[in-house]
Design a protein with these regions (language model features):
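C-terminal segment of classical bacterial N-terminal signal peptides
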Residues: 20-23
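Compositionally biased amphipathic helical and low-complexity segments enriched in hydrophobic
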Residues: 10, 25-26
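Structured, non-membrane catalytic/scaffold regions adjacent to prosthetic-group chemistry
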Residues: 27-387
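Residue-level detector of alpha-helical transmembrane segments in integral membrane proteins
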Residues: 15-16, 47
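N-terminal secretory signal peptides and thylakoid transit peptides that target proteins
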Residues: 1-15
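A generic secondary-structure boundary signal that marks alpha-helix termini
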Residues: 16-17, 159
Length: 387
């Protein structure tokens, strides 16, 4: 077995935290300790390492790896022998396979630019509060993921007609009696040509934090679908039955009142992301020294595309169209900007809302659910114009 340090080198600078797992810091924001390869991130938890991107980094089409959020449900693998690592493909298939990293590397690769977002991004704004990591706005990022199509690997194995779901298991180190992080996706999504077994991120090998040596990439869906550190893919005759499929990562079938309990049988799996926008500049609480300013941000919509973004500078009384950036790609956020001259000095609430090509528009208030998933309320920042 290789050490963590050797693992880091083998992963092309796949950087990890060396030593015993630090104590849990809690769900709130903490002053960031020195985490190699993750400059300036907001620490939500050090127990399993959950890091959030500050909104000021949300200013480009592609998020640098050092600023890409991290969501871990368990401990990251502490050691990995690349000579022994294998990815098995089995279950409802004719020819079970075992693949090495070299075999995956030799297959035809495809690249998908994808906005990856944790289902719980925005959970901190749910009232009443709900359990879970208290993400605010930055559990989201966009990267270029490359690797073989999952469909091509499944075709090699020969999926039987009984295959309905595809299960992913990673090498997460499970503490005690905690259930393993295992999830599945419908065969239709698994065999979509854009679903990948990613081995590269932004042109380099995946880092340890982001799933080296291989991860699933399920574009347009919640981040939990794109399992990291893959070691097993299994074709099932039905949805996987496990903690992170049920009761975990499920949405109510009908809107519920804040604080209301929902039975599991009245829920469905969380899948595609909602339409959403984010104001990156000016920052919330900023003292702006000029009445003339550029409001800038990002908008994304999962499997849909962004149709428009609107901005309000009067707390939502009126809305004006923002200018969308020229760069656009399916599954990918869109940059937007709005030029504004404040009529006078004083306090202002600036808001943004996006509408996608499916006709969905961000709601004015939080659509509460017991897990705080897929919250996409219009974004707001409060500023003070001093000039």
């Amino acid at each position: 077995m290789i050490s963590r340090r050797e693992f880091v080198l083998a992963a092309s600078a796949a950087i990890g935290v060396v030593g015993a797992a630090p104590p849990l810091l809690g769900w709130g924001a903490n002053e960031s300790p020195a985490i190699p390869g993750k400059h300036g991130m907001i620490v939500r938890s050090l127990r399993f390492l959950d890091l959030e991107m500050p909104v000021e980094y949300a200013n480009s089409l592609i998020t640098p790896v050092e600023h890409f959020f991290i969501r871990n449900h368990m401990h990251e693998p502490s050691t990995l022998d690349l000579g022994e690592w294998r990815l098995s493909i089995g279950g409802e298939v004719e020819k079970p396979l075992t693949l090495t990293l070299a075999a995956l590397t030799k297959m035809e690769h495809h690249t998908i630019v994808n906005t990856l977002e944790c289902a719980g991004n925005g959970r901190a704004f749910a009232v009443p509060h709900v359990p879970g990591v208290r993400w605010e706005k930055g559990a989201v990022g966009t990267a270029r993921f490359s690797g073989p199509r999952l469909r091509d690997v499944l075709e090699r194995a020969g999926v039987r007609s009984t295959g309905k779901h595809v299960m992913f298991r990673g090498l997460d180190e499970v503490p005690g009696k905690v259930p393993a992080f295992i999830r599945s996706i419908p065969i239709e999504k698994a065999t979509d040509g854009d679903t990948l077994l990613a081995v590269h991120m932004n042109g380099a090998a995946l880092t340890k934090h982001h799933g080296f040596p291989a991860r699933a990439l399920v574009p347009g869906w919640i981040g939990a679908a794109s399992c990291k550190w893959l070691t097993e893919i299994k074709v099932l005759d039905k949805e996987f039955e496990g903690n992170f499929m049920s009761p975990g990562y499920r949405m109510p079938n009908q809107p519920v009142k804040p604080g209301e309990t929902v039975k599991v049988e009245d829920t469905h799996p969380a899948t595609a992301l909602n339409v959403k926008s984010l104001i990156a500049s000016p920052r919330d609480g900023a003292n702006v020294k000029s009445r003339a300013m550029h409001v800038q941000g990002l908008a994304w919509a999962g499997e849909a595309d962004i149709a428009k973004v609107e901005v309000s500078t009067d707390s939502g009384a009126t809305w004006q169209p923002a200018q969308l950036g020229k760069e656009q790609s399916h599954y990918t956020w869109r940059l937007w900007s709005y030029s504004w001259n404040a009529p006078k000095t004083g306090a202002y609430t600036i808001m943004s809302r996006a509408t996608d090509t499916h006709g969905r528009m961000q709601p004015d208030s939080v659509q509460w659910n017991p897990s705080g998933y897929l919250i996409n309320v219009v974004d707001r920042v409060q500023i003070h114009v001093q000039a």
